[in-house]
Amino acid sequence: MKKNVILLVESLTYLSKVYTTAAVQQGRQTIGMVNPVSLQKAKKLFGAARCLREGRSLTIFAVMNIETGSRVDDSIAEDLKGTANMELVLDTAAARAGIYPPVNLLLSGTKRAELIASKEQLDGIKLIHEMLGSLRAVDMIPQLLSMLEKTSNNEDLLVRIKDWAALMKQ
């Protein structure tokens, strides 16, 4: 029986630190940095979604801590960044302002979107980024939500976004 699974990893950064600590206890230590060998288990877990048979699906959502001031956190994030299919970057200022979801739209996105989206969809996404790019992060989400409320689906949004962009240029 085929099953689709979603795995939530609250902190891939913390899990990687645990693997690093275990490696240190085995005598493999890199002072102030993460031993790349110790990250192989985290990469293997994070990359498991690509290794399924029989058309099953495993989707992994993992949180990574960035911009904490810790060289170890930054090192882990850089090392694991290439494993992800997409990045959703949260914005602290937007969260503090009560904007939800507090997503930084300009830093978030799907890697290699051209493989799964049509040219029209990619052009629409680019246009949305151009329109919202001049706004502060805390203003982007309310503006996008306002646009979404005026449309019934993604296709409608992409059609109307061209008209809105033309109006904004006038």
What are these language model-derived features?
Residues M1-Q170:
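P-loop NTPase catalytic core
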